[in-house]
Amino acid sequence: MALINEHFLKLQNNYLFSDIAKKVNSFKVTHPKDKIIRMGIGDVTQPLAPAVIEAMHKAVEEMASKDTFHGYGPEQGYPFLIDAIIKNDYASRGVFIEPSEVFISDGAKSDCGNIGDMLRHDNSIGVTDPVYPVYIDSNVMSGRTGVLENGKWSDVVYIPCTAENNFVPDLPSRRVDILYLCYPNNPTGTTLTKDELKKWVNYALANDVLIMYDSAYEAYIQDPNIPHSIYEIKGAKKVAIEFRSFSKTAGFTGIRCGYTVVPKELNAFTLDGQRVQLNKLWNRRQCTKFNGTSYITQRGAEAVYSTAGKQQVTATINYYMTNAKIMKEGLQNCGLTVYGGDNAPYLWLKTPDGLSSWKFFDKLLYEVKIVGTPGVGFGPSGEGYLRLTAFGDRDDTLEAMARLRKWLR
């Protein structure tokens, strides 16, 4: 008799974005002629950079010749992409990373969810709240979260990020073994300064805390004083794993490519206190469970770092950040309170008149035909907020702001 992992039964019935999709589909059934403007799920809308397309076309053509055909690649990724990553994402910022510390994958979401494979089930978890749901759900599956009580998991330490603390989390009062940080932040669109991030690195160093640092949106940082990598902070390689993605940087949501950095200086412990290098464990895990990202995909990712690729990708990022500027100004002109959107493609909107997140979601959908993401879906501290994304088409962005002005006047 096969027995299941009963921790899966603890998961809430639906993933946040599945619930949204059901509500939108119900609306479409009763309002088939209405145009919905989607500002909810953070999927991109602009095409891949021409340099990426050209590189992938060339890679496809290589597959048609016996002399240039590529079969299984290295589980860790091809050296040509790893070298480009190190040169452009780290060395350019004064950070030394070894090639064997970079692991190419099919995206940051997979790695964020899979990284727990090499960690015991009884580690204590800390998350900033509100939080990207994958951090919580993947730990529910692994049995680290306890039971759900009044919207919170009993064994998870929630660290509030609210307007009251300027969205800068305080150090936790309870002990945590593993801490998830995401900056620029999803969902609030806020950031940490170098000094604020240094506080967390020092805390981790002093308390043997492992930081899972998700910097999937670092390419959207506009302020030169905001760190792009946690490894810009001294000592961070001893305490942090960093996740990166080409999804929002270069529009790879449908291509799937990202990478994770696991420094060789980073250790965790056995029950009897022996230090174990996490780089070796992650490499072993990947060699067993992952056959590597496709050659064609990795050639496309490499092209992101070419001269033309950088220019084209930056132009697309600027397009989205202009959307964010239009949205933030438009929302503020409507008398709404909004955060984020300056160094991230997300805006965190305070719901008006004390409405709950889902109530405001429903009003926006049915009265304005705009879809956002209810803040409460990201955690208890998200109640009373709605996340909007700047990944839409420019015309849709302008139309959405016009609809809101008309609705709120």
UniProtKB/Swiss-Prot annotation:
The keyword Transferase applies. One of its GO terms (biological process) is lysine biosynthetic process via diaminopimelate, diaminopimelate-aminotransferase pathway. Pathway: Amino-acid biosynthesis; L-lysine biosynthesis via DAP pathway; LL-2,6-diaminopimelate from (S)-tetrahydrodipicolinate (aminotransferase route): step 1/1. Gene3D superfamilies: Aspartate Aminotransferase, domain 1 (3.90.1150.10), Type I PLP-dependent aspartate aminotransferase-like (Major domain) (3.40.640.10). Its EC number is 2.6.1.83. The modification N6-(pyridoxal phosphate)lysine is found at residue 248. GO terms for molecular function: L,L-diaminopimelate aminotransferase activity; pyridoxal phosphate binding. Keywords: Aminotransferase, Pyridoxal phosphate, Transferase. It is an enzyme of class 2 (transferase). Pyridoxal 5'-phosphate binds at residues 72, 108-109, 132, 186, 217, 245-247, 256, 291. CDD domains: AAT_like (cd00609). Belongs to the class-I pyridoxal-phosphate-dependent aminotransferase family. LL-diaminopimelate aminotransferase subfamily. Homodimer. Involved in the synthesis of meso-diaminopimelate (m-DAP or DL-DAP), required for both lysine and peptidoglycan biosynthesis. Catalyzes the direct conversion of tetrahydrodipicolinate to LL-diaminopimelate. This is LL-diaminopimelate aminotransferase. The lineage of its organism: Bacteria, Pseudomonadati, Bacteroidota, Bacteroidia, Bacteroidales. The gene is dapL.
